[in-house]
Curated annotation (Swiss-Prot):
Keywords: ATP synthesis, Cell membrane, Hydrogen ion transport, Ion transport, Membrane, Transport. Its main location: membrane. The gene is atpD. GO terms for cellular component: plasma membrane. Has multiple subunits with at least A(3), B(3), C, D, E, F, H, I and proteolipid K(x). Signal peptide: none annotated. It comes from Thermococcus gammatolerans (strain DSM 15229 / JCM 11827 / EJ3). It is a peripheral membrane protein. This is A-type ATP synthase subunit D. Disulfide bonds: none annotated. Component of the A-type ATP synthase that produces ATP from ADP in the presence of a proton gradient across the membrane.
Length: 214
């Protein structure tokens, strides 16, 4: 049996508890609907994350292959000099957006792909293999930033799902059962009190009639 609430067994408390149960059940339904919607959104984004991860792994494989080719064709030292001469890439701005009531990151950045002349090593190395390797790693960077945003969104949605689940379970298995058990107890207690009053009045009536007869 569920634990009872510490309230007085009165009709006022009975009415109050019935109202609270109605509100709790409405709240439970809203939270359950929210939980279901969050789970659907989570798996939609999860599928996107899997696709991005596959694409990233493929592009990283290609990028390292082109880097190895550039090292063979241009030489280790010229490649290192080109890497040291590369200008910093564009800045990334992290904002916030709302997904199902959850604040998640929104990474705003223009594409990382640049022309060879914009990378800073144009006069250091003219090998086309270095340019190809740089281009492939810029593609990797584009995907990595997008994947980071999606994976962080998944983490936050997962936390919100867990929080919502705990609230749903608390209402379903603890709060509502306790209130319903208390309502049942108050009804029983009020019935007992009503019977006690009935028999008390009956005895009083009998005493009055007995005295009147004597």
């Amino acid at each position: 049996m569920a634990e009872l609430l510490n309230v007085k067994p009165t009709r006022m408390e009975l009415l109050n508890l019935k109202r609270r149960i109605q509100l709790a059940k409405k709240g439970h339904k809203l939270l359950k609907d929210k939980q279901d919607a969050l789970i659907m959104e989570f798996f939609t984004i999860y599928d996107e994350a899997l696709q991005l991860r596959r694409e990233l792994n493929e592009k990283m494989g290609v990028a390292f292959e082109t880097l190895t080719r550039a090292q063979i064709e241009a030489g280790t030292l010229p490649l290192r000099e080109a890497a040291l001469a590369v200008k910093p890439n564009k800045e990334v701005e992290i904002k916030r957006r709302n997904v199902m009531g959850v604040s998640v990151p929104l990474i705003e950045a223009e594409g990382f792909k640049r022309k060879a002349s914009e990378r800073g090593y144009a006069f250091v190395s003219t090998s086309p293999f270095v340019d190809i390797a740089a281009e492939k790693f810029e593609e990797v960077l584009d995907l990595a930033v997008r994947l980071a945003e999606v994976e962080e969104t998944l983490k936050r949605l997962a936390r919100e799902i867990e929080t919502t689940k705990r609230r749903v379970n608390a209402l379903e298995y603890i709060i509502i059962p306790r209130m319903e058990a208390t309502v049942k107890f108050i009804k029983q207690r009020l019935d007992e009190m009503e019977r006690e009053n009935f028999f008390r009045l009956k005895r009083v009536k009998a005493l009055i009639e007995a005295r009147s007869g004597s």
